[in-house]
């Protein structure tokens, strides 16, 4: 079972495996989360094991914990192999330090949009701090972020 953020060329390394796309993109879901959870259980019982392939780190807004808990509740043994989160990799690739002595003592990683499709309250808190702020899944809210930051600076 693989997500939308997985580079499909990786699937060639498992050419004998059944590949099921369960990806999600804003407003467009191949499967709802409950269906993905059920597929994990069904395929594990039917095939003896299942691989849940996700892009980045499944424990950073990736529902990895939810899926592992669901599998464990159904008696499945799980193993986790962490990926590299874009929250860390992208700033590094652009030579942007997440922390830097004298300017940023911490960093926040925040979802841009909540389950209810609202701006996260944590964004408002982060805008008031001196921390580096990384917002994931936030392109549709980028004007709201900029307006919020401008209001904070004006105070």
Where in the sequence are the language-model features?
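Beta-strand/loop-alpha-helix module characteristic of Rossmann-like adenine-cofactor folds
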Residues: 2-5, 9-13, 18, 50, ...
């Amino acid at each position: 079972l693989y997500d939308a953020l997985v580079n499909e060329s990786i699937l060639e390394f498992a050419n004998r495996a059944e590949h099921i796309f369960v990806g999600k993109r804003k407003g467009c879901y191949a499967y709802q989360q409950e269906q993905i959870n059920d597929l994990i259980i069904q395929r594990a019982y039917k095939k003896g094991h299942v691989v849940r392939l996700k892009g980045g780190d499944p424990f950073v807004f990736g529902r990895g914990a939810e899926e592992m808990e669901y599998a464990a509740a159904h008696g499945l043994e799980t193993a986790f192999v962490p990926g590299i989160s874009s929250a860390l990799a992208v700033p590094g690739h652009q030579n942007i330090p997440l922390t830097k002595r004298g300017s940023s003592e911490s960093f926040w990683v925040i979802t841009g949009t909540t389950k209810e499709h609202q701006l996260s309250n944590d964004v408002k808190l982060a805008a008031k701090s001196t921390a580096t702020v990384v917002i994931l899944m936030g392109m549709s809210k980028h004007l709201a972020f900029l307006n919020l930051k401008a209001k904070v600076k004006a105070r």
